[in-house]
């Protein structure tokens, strides 16, 4: 007979600050936060499916589609009979977190060559860090186990594993960096009108590659067949993670502009001003041919 032991698990995914703040548009900010929430939610649902109980955050996980946002971490408890079972659950939690973005990554590598596919996969694999620590509850009070796990989590996060990027036998990435994160090489680029006319793209975009499209997905300035103009602008270059953020739930005119966000407090005041509202009504009426005197 194998006896069950109860374990407390703390799960966390990052990087948070760098991922969210690497942005040029309000959609980038929205997508960064939303993606981390969805990745954590997928891990939570898997954990519950394995018989786990979520302690924090407290949400109605029976209706996951109604959950708009959650933190990038959760605390749960689960009963397991062996250390191997616990380790398998932790490994699966890490894998489940990335499933949310696999489809977007696969969309990028569609119809690309092996060199570019490898480059995209390396950037994808090296970016997100999923951390899990677990401790047996036993006869110890919950707060004692939890506090010890928090200390372990801090230690684990500070002991980061280093992965060396290698492309075609060349150590490191040489070439133009992403407009969002400024760290990873560009994998998706939209040409400017001038580059379309001259049929030339700056050599800085590529890494000694002939033909150049082996290293970067290049779109013409007005080509919206594969990527819309609001997803990637002229002259803009995006890395794998930045491209996924830009594509994620991106619809035309869905997000407010940064200018409108800065002026929202003034718009709220104007809505309370009857004179302004009457003026707006007259202007809108004149557009419809019903101008009032």
Each model region followed by its residue ranges:
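Regulatory and interdomain segments flanking nucleotide-handling catalytic cores
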Residues: 1-293
């Amino acid at each position: 007979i194998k006896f069950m032991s109860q374990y407390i698990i703390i799960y966390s995914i990052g990087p948070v600050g760098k991922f969210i703040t690497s942005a040029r548009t309000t959609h980038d900010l929205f997508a960064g936060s939303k993606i981390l929430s969805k990745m954590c939610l997928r891990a939570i649902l898997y954990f519950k499916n394995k018989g786990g109980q979520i302690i924090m955050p407290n949400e109605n996980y029976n209706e996951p589609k109604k959950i708009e946002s959650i933190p990038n971490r959760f605390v749960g408890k689960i009963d397991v009979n062996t250390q191997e079972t616990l380790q398998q659950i932790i490994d699966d939690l890490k894998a489940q977190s990335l499933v949310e973005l696999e489809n977007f990554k696969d969309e990028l590598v569609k119809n690309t060559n092996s060199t570019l596919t490898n480059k995209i996969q390396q950037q994808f694999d090296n970016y997100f860090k999923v951390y899990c620590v677990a401790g047996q509850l036993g006869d110890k009070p919950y707060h004692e186990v939890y506090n010890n796990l928090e200390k372990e989590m801090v230690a684990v996060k500070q002991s980061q594993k280093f992965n060396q990027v290698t492309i075609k036998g060349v150590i490191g990435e040489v070439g133009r960096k992403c407009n969002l994160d400024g760290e990873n090489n560009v994998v998706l680029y939209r040409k400017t009108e001038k580059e379309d006319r001259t049929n030339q793209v700056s050599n800085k975009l590529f890494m000694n590659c002939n033909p150049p499209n082996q290293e970067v997905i290049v779109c013409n300035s007005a080509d919206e067949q594969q990527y819309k103009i609001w997803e990637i602008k002229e002259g803009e270059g995006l890395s794998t993670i930045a491209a996924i953020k830009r594509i994620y739930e991106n619809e035309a005119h869905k997000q407010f502009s940064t200018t409108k966000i800065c002026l929202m407090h003034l718009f709220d005041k104007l809505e309370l001003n009857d004179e302004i509202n009457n003026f707006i009504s007259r202007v809108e009426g004149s557009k419809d041919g019903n101008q009032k005197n």
